[in-house]
Design a protein with these regions (language model features):
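N-terminal start-of-chain detector that recognizes signal peptides
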Residues: 37-41, 45-48, 101, 232-233, ...
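Alpha/beta enzyme core
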Residues: 53-69, 73, 77-102, 112-259, ...
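Metal-centered catalytic cores of metalloenzymes
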Residues: 301
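Short, hydrophobic beta-strand segments that form beta-sheet elements in well-ordered domains
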Residues: 107-109
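Charged, compositionally biased N-terminal leader segments and the immediate start
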Residues: 2-68
């Protein structure tokens, strides 16, 4: 099944053949969607979902699902091999200590630790996620981004998270944004690639929707809210807009795109709210730990504590 980019490229070629002056590829892709959304209408929609739907998802079954959707993350300047290995070993022990609970969906760290994680992880079904492409700023040469991504995959990464070139996006260089994402997706091949939008830096709902669509159009397998390194990370409003973009893209193309809220998920209720928004906007098809991921460190112990009914700091 082709992407929007494939379809638009064919349309452009046909128009050129008859001498029609056309919009650029990215303009044609965006023109198929309604980008005239306001922050006020998004906030109203989110408030309604929270008021009417969240309570029905605040239960043990949903919390177990959320635990199984976590990408257990360490992305600190002070990370060491010992710290990363300790995180891996906790995941290795989890099944024996909590046999009735789902293990986390993935471990997420910098790519210099990938081989260590790949060599020491013993649990089937847990992905190794790497942030590449000069995370968190994305401000470097494209060649550096491609080499880092290729090395991460060579060492055993099974998911790649990159940051959209936010500066290019804010300056209106949508072609540059798409070219970068597409180039890195070509490096990833069959390895799923998440594109981090850094929604807190984009300014408004319309910009978040535009960035979401451009990223999917350029090859993202998932879109992700944030690096967790900026002042504003994931919010219910940004997740709602991203879900709307995913739904519209899916309705037009039949291509399912995953979602990963990350950064600032500080409470179990935060996670329940995100899950509820996904359920209401995208539906049950997205409520698997393949299509829905959460990037977090602190939330994992909070979820586990609520599930077992006593405070624990296992992770």
């Amino acid at each position: 099944m082709g992407t929007i980019k494939d379809t638009v490229s064919k349309d452009i070629q046909a128009q050129k053949a008859v001498g029609i002056v056309e919009k650029s590829e990215y303009e044609q892709a965006l023109s198929q969607y309604n980008l005239n959304i306001t922050d006020e209408e998004v906030k109203a929609a989110v408030t309604k979902i929270i008021a009417e739907k969240v309570s029905e998802n605040d239960n043990l079954e949903v919390k177990k699902f959320l635990l199984g959707s976590v990408e257990l993350t360490t992305l600190s300047t002070t990370d060491t091999e010992e710290k990363v290995l300790e995180m891996v070993e906790k995941v290795n022990r989890f099944d024996s200590e909590y046999p009735d609970l789902p293990h986390v969906a993935a471990l997420c760290a910098y790519p210099c630790f990938t081989k260590l994680m790949a060599d020491s992880l013993e649990v089937d079904g847990v992905d190794i996620t790497n942030v590449t492409g000069n995370f968190p700023s994305s401000q470097t040469f494209l060649e550096v981004k491609t080499i880092e991504t290729a090395l991460a995959i060579k060492d055993g990464a099974t998911h790649i998270d990159i940051v959209m070139p936010v500066g290019k996006f804010l300056s209106g260089d949508y072609e540059g944004v798409c070219d970068t994402i597409n180039e890195l997706k070509q490096v990833c091949g069959d390895v799923p690639m998440k594109v981090i939008l850094e929604t807190g830096d984009l300014g408004n709902a319309s910009a978040i929707k535009t960035a979401s669509l451009l990223s999917m159009y350029a090859g993202a397998d998932y879109i992700k809210t944030s690096t967790g390194k900026e002042k504003i990370s994931a919010t219910p409003e940004s997740v709602y807009v991203m879900c709307q973009a995913i739904k519209e893209y899916y309705d037009k193309t039949g291509i399912q795109i995953g979602l990963k809220p990350a950064g600032g998920i500080n409470t179990v209720m935060d996670a329940v709210i995100y899950c509820t928004i996904v359920k209401e906007v995208l539906g049950e098809k997205w409520l698997t730990n393949y299509w829905f991921r959460m990037g977090t460190s602190r939330l994992t112990n909070l979820l586990l504590s609520e599930i077992i009914g006593t405070e624990t700091k296992f992770f």
